[in-house]
């Protein structure tokens, strides 16, 4: 438990800072652009991380939203209940996960449709010989063809959105103080460490996507959708009274409760 507490202390001192929340979006944009320049001008040699079957991609990135929801759900529930003691406020804050799920579903469906309507089936990866008889990506692949369309980077979108959402929700730790004897101490500490490491994985794999995969425009659009999903909620809608609200993070609990009143 001591090692876990040290990790939690380190993460509180890094990811929970307001400067991190303020600068992380710009850092992700800069990393995406820099990685894309490297990919275009001086491609890195093939490595384990450039293989789509690597462990982080298969077991984490492809399940990124599931991982994020599974860890944020108990974290939001425990920390917000610890601070407010009101089930109604906890449920209201948990609705952020429903909003995030809707954003994830709508964006991924949109990306899939864009790739479908802008794509064609080819005989080879070199885009030779259009196979007009195959009108969908699934049918094209089933018949051994290669589908090529405008493939907005789903990884760039989702990893951006998940990382920013976690950092926003962890801001509540400015107010959460539990000593070792508190019945929620172990659970919250464990969740802080898990969410912290998950955030580092998302940022690292975002960098790998920038360096190894997709064209610049595909990554720009993917990152842009992730930023819009984050800013449209935490930067705009959640500031309104009719919304899930922001995590409690004001100087006094009274002010925090007033913030969540309808």
UniProtKB/Swiss-Prot annotation:
Residues 1-23, 79-93, 167-190, 240-262 are cytoplasmic. Keywords: Endoplasmic reticulum, Hydrolase, Lipid metabolism, Membrane, Transmembrane, Transmembrane helix. InterPro entries: FIT (IPR019388), FITM1/2 (IPR046401). Residues 45-57, 115-145, 212-218 are lumenal. It is an enzyme of class 3 (hydrolase). Its EC number is 3.6.1.-. Widely expressed, with highest levels in white and brown adipose tissues (at protein level). In the heart, mRNA expression levels do not correlate well with protein levels, suggesting post-transcriptional regulation in this organ. It catalyses: an acyl-CoA + H2O = an acyl-4'-phosphopantetheine + adenosine 3',5'-bisphosphate + 2 H(+); (9Z)-octadecenoyl-CoA + H2O = S-(9Z-octadecenoyl)-4'-phosphopantetheine + adenosine 3',5'-bisphosphate + 2 H(+); (5Z,8Z,11Z,14Z)-eicosatetraenoyl-CoA + H2O = S-(5Z,8Z,11Z,14Z-eicosatetraenoyl)-4'-phosphopantetheine + adenosine 3',5'-bisphosphate + 2 H(+); hexadecanoyl-CoA + H2O = S-hexadecanoyl-4'-phosphopantetheine + adenosine 3',5'-bisphosphate + 2 H(+). GO terms for cellular component: endoplasmic reticulum membrane; mitochondrion. The chain crosses the membrane at residues 24-44, 58-78, 94-114, 146-166, 191-211, 219-239. Its main location: endoplasmic reticulum. The active site is at residues 155, 214. Coiled coil: none annotated. Disruption phenotype: Homozygous knockout mice display embryonic lethality. Heterozygous knockout mice exhibit shortened left ventricular end-diastolic dimension and shortened left ventricular end-systolic dimension. They also exhibit improved profiles upon pressure overload-induced heart failure. GO terms for biological process: cytoskeleton organization; fat cell differentiation; fatty-acyl-CoA catabolic process; intracellular triglyceride homeostasis; lipid droplet formation; lipid droplet organization; lipid homeostasis; regulation of cell morphogenesis. Disulfide bonds: none annotated. It is a multi-pass membrane protein. It holds the Pfam family FIT. One of its GO terms (molecular function) is coenzyme A diphosphatase activity. It is found in: Endoplasmic reticulum membrane. Fatty acyl-coenzyme A (CoA) diphosphatase that hydrolyzes fatty acyl-CoA to yield acyl-4'-phosphopantetheine and adenosine 3',5'-bisphosphate. Preferentially hydrolyzes unsaturated long-chain acyl-CoA substrates such as oleoyl-CoA/(9Z)-octadecenoyl-CoA and arachidonoyl-CoA/(5Z,8Z,11Z,14Z)-eicosatetraenoyl-CoA in the endoplasmic reticulum (ER) lumen. This catalytic activity is required for maintaining ER structure and for lipid droplets (LDs) biogenesis, which are lipid storage organelles involved in maintaining lipid and energy homeostasis. Belongs to the FIT family. This is Acyl-coenzyme A diphosphatase FITM2. It comes from Mus musculus (Mouse). The lineage of its organism: Eukaryota, Metazoa, Chordata, Craniata, Vertebrata.
């Amino acid at each position: 438990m001591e090692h876990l507490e040290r990790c939690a202390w380190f993460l509180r001192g890094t990811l929970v800072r307001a400067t991190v929340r303020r600068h992380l979006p710009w850092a992700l944009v800069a990393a995406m652009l820099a990685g894309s320049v490297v990919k275009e001008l001086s491609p890195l040699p093939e490595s384990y991380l450039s293989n789509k079957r690597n462990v982080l991609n298969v077991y984490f990135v492809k399940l990124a939203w599931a991982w994020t929801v599974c860890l944020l759900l108990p974290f939001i529930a425990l920390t917000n209940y610890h601070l407010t003691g009101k089930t109604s406020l906890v449920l209201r804050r948990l609705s952020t996960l429903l909003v995030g799920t809707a954003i994830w579903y709508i964006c991924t469906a949109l990306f899939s449709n864009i790739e479908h309507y802008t794509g064609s089936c080819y005989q080879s990866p070199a885009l030779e010989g259009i196979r007009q008889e195959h009108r969908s990506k699934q049918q094209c692949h089933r018949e051994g063809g290669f589908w090529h369309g405008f493939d907005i980077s789903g990884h760039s979108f989702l990893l951006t959105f998940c990382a920013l959402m976690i950092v926003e929700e962890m801001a509540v730790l400015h107010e959460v103080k539990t000593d070792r004897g508190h019945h929620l101490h172990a659970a919250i500490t464990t969740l802080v460490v898990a969410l912290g490491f998950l955030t580092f994985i998302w940022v690292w794999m975002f960098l790998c996507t920038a360096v190894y995969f997709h064209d610049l425009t595909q990554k720009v659009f993917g990152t842009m959708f992730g930023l819009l999903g984050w800013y449209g909620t935490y930067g705009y809608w959640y500031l309104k009274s009719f919304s899930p609200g922001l995590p409690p993070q004001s100087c006094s609990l009274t002010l925090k409760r007033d913030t969540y009143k309808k």
